From Swiss-Prot:
InterPro entries: HisE (IPR008179), PRib-ATP_PPHydrolase-like (IPR021130)
Name under which the protein is recorded: Phosphoribosyl-ATP pyrophosphatase
Coiled-coil residue windows: none
Sorted UniProt keywords: Amino-acid biosynthesis, ATP-binding, Cytoplasm, Histidine biosynthesis, Hydrolase, Nucleotide-binding
Pathway field: Amino-acid biosynthesis; L-histidine biosynthesis; L-histidine from 5-phospho-alpha-D-ribose 1-diphosphate: step 2/9
Membership in a protein family: Belongs to the PRA-PH family.
Catalytic activity, reaction form: 1-(5-phospho-beta-D-ribosyl)-ATP + H2O = 1-(5-phospho-beta-D-ribosyl)-5'-AMP + diphosphate + H(+)
Top-level taxonomic group: Bacteria
Pfam families documented for this protein: PRA-PH (PF01503)
Organism ancestry: Bacteria, Bacillati, Actinomycetota, Actinomycetes, Propionibacteriales
Organism: Nocardioides sp. (strain ATCC BAA-499 / JS614)
Stored CDD domains: NTP-PPase_HisE
E.C. code: 3.6.1.31
Amino acid sequence: MKTFDELWAELSEKARSRPEGSGTVRALDAGVHGIGKKLVEEAAESWMAAEHEGPERAAEEISQLLYHAQVLMLATGIDLDDVYAHL
């Protein structure tokens, strides 16, 4: 299990080092539009899982939503402090 901050550190390192075969690198290469489409997809899947599939599936989908939100943050140059300033 990892925290939101630990995920951020991991994804930031992948964005910096760009390891071959990385799904994060592929997502970043898709650009803001591609990442945004994936974020919307994961939001819908989170909602559907919460409404129809139960807490375990909802948690899984929400984890994917958070992952793609962080990838979008990396693609746009937003860091955790930028987001935390609005919480």
